[in-house]
């Protein structure tokens, strides 16, 4: 790995690329395939640190997962809902909050078995009480530091009971943990969210044969009934729109650019960035639309747009673009007028405090950003100069700073740049390809 990257501003972007497989779907394909009966074949898997942490933990639980090669399909032999083994060692989730939170739900109902989950220094400071609390309502026996809010987390598998759970925030990780626990709970489990969050878990569980339904027009009430078995499937994972977003914004703000991003997942619970790009007046089109395994996909063609408009992000759209806030903060710096991000306090509990980190790092380029408790106010029409900036070990910050460097005058230096490997191992190669 190269932890310092130099980027010269002024290069336009031209060409077509295929971004890595969707991170959210990669995690879920592994987990659901592991508790299905029979074989599940996975193609398009994201070969990066976080999903590989999930694979490693599942192997320790007795799942037969082969050595995963980049860009190669592989097959899992599922254990069924009752086949999870008590591990002989601690389950290390690395830096992956998705791994830890979804496994909490998966393991809470494995009766009579003991599990310990831990992670790296960053993950062990992230809040787990939001998952622990609803699982405890179902009968889960879970403990950890700070009254079960911080890892290491200890789980003693217990008999769970279905119930109705209202979540205070719209979180796909919390919802998914409850639904996975619901597979082993007696009766019916219902999750009601304040806003709809990404629904990859629901789609995949349905494809595997789970008795799951969505109630209400807004998709905020998900109901799962226990009983029955999951059956192994063939899963084709589309490109990750969160990874594509860096090129979508780069092509919009870097002069004389045109980029085609092929086979991107267009799940409507993930496409909030397209709504914001519409508000900005970005020049893009979606081509080759289709549906694979219940997930809509398409290719996104983006050209440079002039006189981009400022925007406001708030309310129910946040869960649909929560991972895109760092790169949209960069975009806001080049819009006419003042943009504002509200209701985004959840970003303070990601790999870093992304609100604070993006304000701090972009200001080094000359951005005018005011940090608020729940968001940011960004003055547009910035003139970026070169700077030495730092990802602060956050993968999405690293890639956002790389795009910001393209529109800065001079050569910028990004420290700890290869944090990007967490979700996009080929990011720097793709950047070189598009700027050559």
From Swiss-Prot:
Belongs to the EPSP synthase family. It comes from Prochlorococcus marinus (strain MIT 9312). It is found in: Cytoplasm. Pathway: Metabolic intermediate biosynthesis; chorismate biosynthesis; chorismate from D-erythrose 4-phosphate and phosphoenolpyruvate: step 6/7. This is 3-phosphoshikimate 1-carboxyvinyltransferase. The keyword Secreted does not apply. Keywords: Amino-acid biosynthesis, Aromatic amino acid biosynthesis, Cytoplasm, Transferase. GO terms for molecular function: 3-phosphoshikimate 1-carboxyvinyltransferase activity. The active site is at residue 323. It comes from the Bacteria. Pfam families: EPSP_synthase. It catalyses: 3-phosphoshikimate + phosphoenolpyruvate = 5-O-(1-carboxyvinyl)-3-phosphoshikimate + phosphate. GO terms for cellular component: cytoplasm. Its EC number is 2.5.1.19. One of its GO terms (biological process) is chorismate biosynthetic process. Signal peptide: none annotated. InterPro entries: Enolpyruvate_Tfrase_dom, Enolpyruvate_Tfrase_sf, EPSP_synthase, EPSP_synthase_CS, RNA3'P_cycl/enolpyr_Trfase_a/b. Catalyzes the transfer of the enolpyruvyl moiety of phosphoenolpyruvate (PEP) to the 5-hydroxyl of shikimate-3-phosphate (S3P) to produce enolpyruvyl shikimate-3-phosphate and inorganic phosphate. The keyword Secreted does not apply. Phosphoenolpyruvate binds at residues 23, 97, 126, 173, 354, 396. Monomer.
